[in-house]
């Protein structure tokens, strides 16, 4: 509930159906005026209003991942057919997206069975995944982890590191349920070999590769190189929701409900944000979670060897590897130097501005929206990732044309292998 001047607004905690009638009620005494007098409990009837949402895509398209029914590359946005899209998650050259009717659609590279359609076939336009009870899908390298509305966990596609969580390395091209638990509420699949997930009780679970201690189990000596079933990390206050979990092939990060941010794994380029970094010869590792300073962290998304995160005050921060300018600091280093290891930043550095809203990342590219509906991008741009109609890398934010881009973290939901995403392409939502 939000109160502003003489207006009171209520925000649903879950999506509203466009076909249902809802009744809103509150008991007597719950709401009072400034004199302390209670308003009489009452009820209101309303129908949710669903606006049209369009998907726009650009970048690499070798597997049809832009949904254009072709394999042509685009360095400026092109629309994917349809106006009832709700949100999107990307993987390595493929995508899954939800529509308003809760159907899920796939397009792009179907290698390793990534489509979940019982085939290793690529699709250059959206095709439907069976079922309407999916609530969360997150993607990594040619594979997916998903949660249904009943709290069950599912997986399919690439599984060489045990990322299904079913205690096997078998790869399947259609969804398989992982265990019998019905309390999963968020899942984050990243890189080629790791998954993190939370349950409704606030616990955090991880599985997959453990080579760099990125599972946070206080094991970094290689004794156990991978876990193919979920293992719990200490604590019961881990946050869930869009962009609360992050990571890449060698490190992980997560936000707690108190706004603190924690990281673990490899720290070669300062990606753990602890104001210390290793060198090529002696990389520093932390095999259990360590806190990054601050208590107002809101969302986080990882690039290849670094992180991008927002705070509750609308500021945007970046740290780690900066070879392509992905930290937004107006500097980059295409060649290493002895005194400046790819211009890495081992502690959070602020990107100018205080109205940043949602974030998404690829391997070395960053996208972000502001509260005014503008959309910005920077970093790697070889395949037109920045949608600025050229392929020059940018080390500070550049605006993508338009002011009607959807704000809120669900707009650029996950760019996995990044966040909602792939390494070389982007899908974004407009509201019409």
Task: State what each model feature region is.
Residues 76-86, 125-133, 149-153, 200-204, ...:
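Thr-biased low-complexity repeat/linker tracts and other Thr-enriched repetitive architectures
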Residues 18, 25-51:
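Acidic, Ser/Thr/Gly/Pro-rich low-complexity segments and short DxT(G/T)-type signature motifs
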Residues 55-75, 107-125, 156-174, 208-228, ...:
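Short glycine/serine- and acidic-residue-enriched loop/turn motifs that recur at repeat junctions
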Residues 49-80, 85-88, 106, 415-416, ...:
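An edge-strand/N-cap motif at the start of beta-rich repeat modules
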Residues 57, 94-97, 106, 143-146, ...:
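Conserved core positions of repeat-based scaffolds
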Residues 1-13, 235-237:
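Extracellular beta-sheet repeat scaffolds used for adhesion and glycan interaction
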Residues 15-16, 28-32, 37, 60-63, ...:
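Acidic glycine-/aspartate-rich tracts in secreted/extracellular proteins
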């Amino acid at each position: 509930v939000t109160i502003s001047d003489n207006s009171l607004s209520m925000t649903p905690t879950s999506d509203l159906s466009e076909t249902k009638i809802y009744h809103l009620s509150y008991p007597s005494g719950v709401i009072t005026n400034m004199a302390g007098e209670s308003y009489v409990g009452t009820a209101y009837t309303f129908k949710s209003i669903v606006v049209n949402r369009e998907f726009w895509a650009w970048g690499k398209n070798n597997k049809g991942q832009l949904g254009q029914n072709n394999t042509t590359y685009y360095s400026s946005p092109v629309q994917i057919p349809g106006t009832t899209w709700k949100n999107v998650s990307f993987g390595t050259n493929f995508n899954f997206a939800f529509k308003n009717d809760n159907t899920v659609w796939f397009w792009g590279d179907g290698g390793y069975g990534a489509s979940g359609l019982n085939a290793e076939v690529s699709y250059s336009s959206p095709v439907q995944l069976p079922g309407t009870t999916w609530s969360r899908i997150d993607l990594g390298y040619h594979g997916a982890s998903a949660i249904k509305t009943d709290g069950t966990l599912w997986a399919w596609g690439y599984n060489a590191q045990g990322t299904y969580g079913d205690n096997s390395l078998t790869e399947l091209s259609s969804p398989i349920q992982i265990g019998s638990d019905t309390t999963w509420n968020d899942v984050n699949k990243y890189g080629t070999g790791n998954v993190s997930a939370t349950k409704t009780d606030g616990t955090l679970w991880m599985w997959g590769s453990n080579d760099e201690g990125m599972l946070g189990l206080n094991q970094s000596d290689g004794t156990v190189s991978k876990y193919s079933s979920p293992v719990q990390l200490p604590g019961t206050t881990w946050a869930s929701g869009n962009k609360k979990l992050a990571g890449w092939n060698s490190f992980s990060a997560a936000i707690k409900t108190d706004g603190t941010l924690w990281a673990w794994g490899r720290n070669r380029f300062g990606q753990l944000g602890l104001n210390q970094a290793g060198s090529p010869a002696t990389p520093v590792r932390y095999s259990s979670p360590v806190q990054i300073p601050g208590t107002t962290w809101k969302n986080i998304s990882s690039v290849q060897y670094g992180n991008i995160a927002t705070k509750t005050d609308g500021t945007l921060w970046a740290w780690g590897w900066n070879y392509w300018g992905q930290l937004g600091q107006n500097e980059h280093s295409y060649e290493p130097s002895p005194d400046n290891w790819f211009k890495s930043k081992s502690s959070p550095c602020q990107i100018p501005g205080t109205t940043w809203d949602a974030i998404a990342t690829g391997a070395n590219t960053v996208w972000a929206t502001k509260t005014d509906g503008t959309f910005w991008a920077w970093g790697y741009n070889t395949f037109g990732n920045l949608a600025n109609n050229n392929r020059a890398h940018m080390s500070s934010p550049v605006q993508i044309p338009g002011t009607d881009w959807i704000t809120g973290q669900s707009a650029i939901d996950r760019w996995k292998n990044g966040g909602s995403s792939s390494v070389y392409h982007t899908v974004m939502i407009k509201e019409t």
